[in-house]
Amino acid sequence: MKVIASSLRKGNVVEKDGRLYVILSAENIHPGKGTPVTQLDMRRITDGVKVSERYRTTEQVERAFVEDREHTFLYKDGEGSHFMNPESYEQVAVPDDVIGDQAAYLQEGMAVMLSLHNGVPLAIELPQRVTLEIVETEPVTKGQTASSSYKPAVLSNGVRTLVPPHITTGTRVVIMTADGSYVERAKD
């Protein structure tokens, strides 16, 4: 679908020279003299190369149709991580490079949003928070309740994070998937 360059926003996917690019930033520049331009910083989806392009604001750009669908995580194997569409029961294998560091937070039965272009997965969005168990941490030290210091801990998925001093091994905690930071003790 052709759109004018000034209408493109961060997160849109465009097609250029037969390749797909995701827009990292889009800025409309209006110089005092001359025609206004749209500056796009993009990342090529196939290999992650960052590209910067300038278009006249009225220039037509091919915007790729990307479909966001909810999928359920099933399992991981040599092909990648496998997800199922809960409506059609169709399964999709997503390569590890699409998931990236977020793979550590995938749990069986977890609902995620997959961005698909012609049935090919481009990106994945995990829930903001996940509940995990602490498998290793330092013992509780009495008298540290007044300070706001944090201690290192290892989660059940192998990720290291910092937790408050009162958290012990075996405690279930809520973690942010974006940065792996501690949110709160799980309420279950």
Curated annotation (Swiss-Prot):
A Pfam family of this chain: EFP_N
Name under which the protein is recorded: Elongation factor P
Gene of this entry: efp
InterPro entries: Elong-fact-P_C, NA-bd_OB-fold, Rib_uL2_dom2, Transl_elong_fac_P/YeiP, Transl_elong_KOW-like, Transl_elong_P/YeiP_cen, Transl_elong_P/YeiP_CS, Transl_elongation_fac_P
UniProt keyword Protein biosynthesis, yes or no: yes
SUPFAM superfamilies: Nucleic acid-binding proteins, Translation proteins SH3-like domain
GO annotation, cellular component aspect: cytoplasm
Any one GO biological process: peptide biosynthetic process
UniProt keyword list: Cytoplasm, Elongation factor, Protein biosynthesis
HAMAP family cross-referenced by the UniProt entry: EF_P
Membrane spanning residue stretches: none
Biological pathway: Protein biosynthesis; polypeptide chain elongation
Any one GO molecular-function label of the UniProt entry: translation elongation factor activity
Record lineage: Bacteria, Pseudomonadati, Pseudomonadota, Alphaproteobacteria, Hyphomicrobiales
